[in-house]
């Protein structure tokens, strides 16, 4: 009996070991991605404000099922009952909305165009959602719809019922559109001009649809009216309907491509599908996603964490969007969203630097530097074509958010060693943006005249977010100074930016120990409350913004009275009740998101405070950073439709998770340092583009064991609270011993603290 028991026990242990090994072997990371994360959102409360993006990494065109009405920024919401079509979209956020969009929708047994009448019930149980493939059953039409993308094209596979009235509806949307049906070629061409700003007057998205089945019926539509046998339509709201007789289970393929340049270029872009079956396109998309995701090789047996990690990595690799095309001679060209001309070179768009300078672009510099090299080329072109670097591009300059954070994006890329573009043009661009403003946009600096003269933007001169702008401009000046120093520019040219980098001190109120709005006479706001979401700040309050001194935490610490006072102030963020400040202005979704998360005044759903917990590394309490980073990852992220605690914001909030799961974060882009948090996984390998590998191992890591007991780098004990870019680029092995009890003797010496400008 004992022998039998021993054999059974041994077999059980071996089975568990085999299961664990199987769980650790992640061969296809794309299988862990859920594109539905963040889609359970609404105007009042964001859990991401995303849509299921069916696309390739950084693709020019995205595709998504459309549940919202035409023009609704919430194009797909998880709880919606009906699908209205499958939309080519370029939307970065519901707040920015879309441009150049159009929708196609298969219908059966009824001739309809209206979006409400053509809409069909569907179920998530009959929906398959992958980054490279989407499939759904349209119950009202008895049609199965499938789509698979390339960078600028997509292929659809529609399985129709038995009927003589199978149709495909093309809706080119309102605000100016055109369609032409070419029956002899089984083709539809047209364009959409719909946009919400940021485009030249000649903006068009030209499209072409190629069918593999002849049409038995053709019709156009104009503002909802159907015109049978008509093949061409232009006007405010044009559309097309083509029909065919189908057997049950008959498949119709539709190839779709578009171009911002011309019809001819759209036809060239359609060549991305030449010689490929639908399954080929699916397989290619799967391979592309696996290739990019596998550069971060995670080994762990917590499947929930794996799903959350790779789903966030997927979101990190979507924006900025490619906005360039390849001409007939194989040359890179782009339609300029700034001057309307067709010009050579790269262009990227649909990113707001206010969000993404923080860690999205630093992440690209670490893991995908060749892609960011192209993006820097795109910034050179944007400057040459408009006279300014964009701060929020969609597709051209938009008037949204604050700061001149393009300076950080440029500086961080160059400091991290990215080369091969016109850095001198970008140097001139960041200097120009620091001393000018492009009217009607966020580009340059609003209030630069006051800032340059007084050292801050006053709160009584009609400029909103004045205190927040002051803090950002000080950091932006530091970024310019750092770039200039790296370029070897003379002190006479860069000294002014060095001096202005300390301007954050000008709005610090020692009585409040917080940043406070200030008049042009030097008087602090007498009605100030730290929890008020006032007009002196941007989408937050002083508790969120007072720690936004990325480049000089030590200087901020000195203002607050030293390490102890600094730590008390940070601790207070999590203690002050989240309901405080909710009556300070009309409710906005960022306020509600902070309130309901029950983490005090910590508002991870918005960007200004996302770095704050890492600041404990500067104040000799790194174990608190370890505690709070893991708490945020565990509590505020998952791989479900309610994945986020606020807007995902074009990769920024996702990149925060990806970086934090690796165990470090870029508190101050423009330095070469990554500030430590706590690793989430047992083992990670980063396969760098230069062929080197970063290996991160965390022994005894678990839900409870979130604290770093010991740390070794290349076999040697390591007490610093940061790693350098150079260390990582050379290839490195990082070994942690994790524990449930904080080690309060590690990383507490002055030499262990990360970079501060005023040291």
For each feature predicted by the language model, list its residue ranges.
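ATP-dependent phospho-/nucleotidyl transfer catalytic cores
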Residues: 476
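Accessory carbohydrate-recognition regions in carbohydrate-active enzymes
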Residues: 26-361, 365-408, 414-471, 479, ...
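Extracellular attachment/recognition segments
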Residues: 707
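Bacterial N-terminal signal peptides that target proteins for export
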Residues: 2-11
